[in-house]
């Protein structure tokens, strides 16, 4: 998808005459963060390189190591001023969607995690809206984005993006 993102960032989205909302979760939000940079194709290229060449100290990395490597990838992709650039530009209004576990879904590993995710799967089959019993939706949003799209029927907490929460929000969106 990196080649498509380069075309989107350098060609198609550069013609936008009004602000564009970039709403997503997981790796999509990482790509949106790159598209929001002054030189989006270069940021996408850095993300691709960081992703392809990520390294771990062991063959079975701990969750902490995975989190640390993900943070390094994001910092490499965005560059030295990328966080400030994303927050200060007004062309793209990022909305980073995350889910905060509650109740039985708060298990971190093993049987508690399996029980929580199995419960979530069963509730999702019955009704997607019932997932609100197990998760809170948190949308980390650009300061200029007043309303988060596609949240009807879901309890969504809006949090303004800032320099301290951008990287953690991107990681949380990917469940890292």
Can you annotate each of these PLM segments?
Residues 1-21, 34-176:
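Patatin-like phospholipase
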Residues 26:
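Catalytic nucleophile serine of serine hydrolases
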């Amino acid at each position: 998808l990196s080649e498509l993102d380069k075309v989107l960032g350098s060609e198609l989205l550069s013609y936008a005459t009004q602000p564009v909302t970039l709403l997503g979760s997981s790796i999509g939000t990482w790509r949106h963060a790159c598209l929001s940079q002054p030189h989006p194709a270069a940021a996408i290229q850095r993300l691709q390189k960081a992703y392809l060449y990520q390294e771990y100290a062991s063959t079975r990395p701990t969750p902490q190591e995975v989190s640390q490597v993900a943070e390094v990838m994001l910092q490499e992709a965005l560059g030295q001023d990328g966080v400030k650039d994303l927050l200060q530009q007004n062309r793209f209004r990022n909305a980073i969607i995350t889910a905060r576990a509650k109740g039985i879904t708060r298990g971190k590993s093993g049987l508690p995690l399996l029980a929580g995710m199995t419960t979530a799967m069963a509730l999702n089959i019955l009704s997607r809206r019932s997932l609100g019993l197990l998760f809170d939706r948190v949308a980390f949003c650009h300061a200029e984005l007043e309303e988060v799209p596609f949240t009807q029927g879901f309890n969504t907490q809006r949090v303004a993006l800032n320099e301290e929460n951008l990287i953690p929000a991107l990681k949380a969106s990917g469940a890292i």
